[in-house]
């Protein structure tokens, strides 16, 4: 195994995240996870959308820390297949699933604001703040998460092209151990460990969120075009938190 960086992630010596990322780029994904679990702030968690390729990070993290909290934000608008996929992976991998939901029900939100996702960028941003960003921020705070693992990858969209392996947001460290993986890397990992894609993958869904703002991929489209009517890729979680 490649030697892991010895310094603690919380030490003043690692205020230079560029140098730290340069070290981590040379490690395998499992080594990055091992390093972050050993040297990062004690309370770690993984967030997962249980989307198209989510089984990779769920397996990667649960193999090294079986009881790591796995945060799922249930917006109330997920595909039925996503709920069933979450159930199946939770059972198979024995996940410590922590489901967080918005403070306001979908019916009450629609009574107050209408169908926000149909109200342009302003409505989409308000929707994302209510249904996704606020619950995620609450989850991270209530679980006192100091080391936050994600499945972000640079190849997923232009906006993620510069995703570092480790970044600092306030006092929290955000770790993306497969940031440099390609779709082929993901496929190879899933095949090697006999893990499934999301059930909708075979129907042409390459990025899966809420049912009303997700569409099938078609020739000529970028992956990011399949979300939010092509207006944007990010829901705000990885921009605002």
UniProtKB/Swiss-Prot annotation:
Annotated function: Catalyzes the formation of sulfite from phosphoadenosine 5'-phosphosulfate (PAPS) using thioredoxin as an electron donor.
Protein's organism: Xanthomonas oryzae pv. oryzae (strain PXO99A)
Classification via Pfam families: PAPS_reduct (PF01507)
GO cellular component, one term: cytoplasm
Active site, per annotation: 235 (nucleophile)
Stored CDD domains: PAPS_reductase
NCBIfam families: cysH, PAPS_reductase, PRK02090.1
Gene3D superfamilies (alphabetical): HUPs
Catalytic activity: [thioredoxin]-disulfide + sulfite + adenosine 3',5'-bisphosphate + 2 H(+) = [thioredoxin]-dithiol + 3'-phosphoadenylyl sulfate
Gene Ontology molecular-function annotations: phosphoadenylyl-sulfate reductase (thioredoxin) activity
Biological-process GO terms, alphabetical: hydrogen sulfide biosynthetic process; sulfate assimilation, phosphoadenylyl sulfate reduction by phosphoadenylyl-sulfate reductase (thioredoxin)
Originating gene: cysH
InterPro entries reported for this sequence: PAPS/APS_Rdtase, PAPS_reduct_dom, PAPS_reductase_CysH, Rossmann-like_a/b/a_fold
Biological or metabolic pathway of the protein: Sulfur metabolism; hydrogen sulfide biosynthesis; sulfite from sulfate: step 3/3
Protein name (Swiss-Prot/TrEMBL): Phosphoadenosine 5'-phosphosulfate reductase
Primary location class: cytoplasm
UniProt family annotation: Belongs to the PAPS reductase family. CysH subfamily.
Enzyme superclass (EC): oxidoreductase
Keywords: Cytoplasm, Oxidoreductase
Catalytic activity, EC: 1.8.4.8
Location in the cell: Cytoplasm
